[in-house]
Amino acid sequence: MNYTRFFNSVSLARKPSPIRVLTAIAHSSPPSMISMAGGNPNVKTFPIQSATFTLRNGTTIHIGEELMQQALQYSPTPGFPGLLEWVRGLQDHIHTPPLLNKKDHPGAVDILITHGSQDGIARALEAMVSQKDTVLIETPSYPGTLAILKPLGCRLLPVQSDKHGMDPDHLQHILTKWKPSHAMDPSSDIPKLLYCIPNGGNPTGYGLTAERKKKIYQLAREYNLLILEDDPYYYLQFSKPRIPSLLSMDEDGRVIRFDSFSKLISSGLRLGFVSGPKPIIERMQLHMQATVMHASGLSQITLLQILQGWGYEGFKQHADKVTEFYRERKNHCVAAAKKHLTGLAEWSEPSGGMFLWLKLKVPDTFKMITVKAHEKDVLFVPGNAFMLDDQAPSQYVRAAYSVCTAEQMDLAFERLASLIREEQLNPS
């Protein structure tokens, strides 16, 4: 694949930072190396010397003085080497990407540690999207991604979704406006990127079936699309075996996958990682060199100590426990919806994630949720927040069941039912 066509002019103009290059060299050099190159502060001036963390299972991890010095100092942009190695092994263990170990392939998989998954999404889109570009995006969609895309001035084409995720038939219908050969024409407005949340969708809680993933990937091959697989809820699928990722079927180097540790370990550590074609990861690294330089060293070291203590099997066991936790919350949420909202709303049961997507029997939910619900001490997110046109009326609301207890969910939906009845009698 020719990846140059996917980059915008800003990304193509980026050059490696000499200081960042030297940092990577110094980090991998033997102790005999005398470096007067980097502007590193002296670790002897840092007030933090060591730290010990107690995990919920009672075990502890200790970051001693030597490791703490590494955590608090500048480190290579791609990520702390030990964490990169562990994550690479995880991707091989879970997804077995066809191009992970094919170093000579132009689309060989590389990995970048980011400040959470959204940081990776932003860097990818800001490297590839120009004002003239057309981007395919499933609707409804994650507001964080919409917030990145809209200021870039590109044309957004919504792809419909249902309880089985993005509809590949609708995607195919959209793409019939172009011929596959148009991807070779720089002046064509043929889409070059496709964004999707394949599991536990935010806001819907729905997931793509394996059959749909295969069809979407084949359409991407036919029309030379890059797929942005935003998958923070992969491990929170409520059925097993988990549906294989798009990365696991990528033989061309056209899938850029975004993973997150926020949903499984900590949202406050702000760590995620991107797996994708090396030329794209390299461009994202250049962007990172010029901004934050690298993800938090202390967060990376802390996370690595936890992961190494677990091993891959321990990590999977932890993921399964977290999934069971949210499955129970989902069951409570659906039960409360059935109890209070039957006849007032419609929904399909989530296949994963943290959200229930409700279609209320009212013309629009915005004022009802943002004003009236607040007055009744209950909060949801109105559906327009997840739409490309956020000014258009929407009958939907998103309910998050991740934090509330069963009793709180029951009371929340009781209040929502009262709001719906009031809205039906006196529309906002």
Residue ranges and their predicted role:
Residues 42-47, 202-205, 235-236, 265-267, ...:
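Short catalytic/ligand-binding loop motif for oxyanion handling, primarily in non-cytosolic enzymes
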Residues 59-223, 228, 234-252, 256, ...:
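Conserved core of the PLP fold type I
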Residues 275, 357-359, 400-402:
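Short hydrophobic/aromatic beta-strand micro-patches
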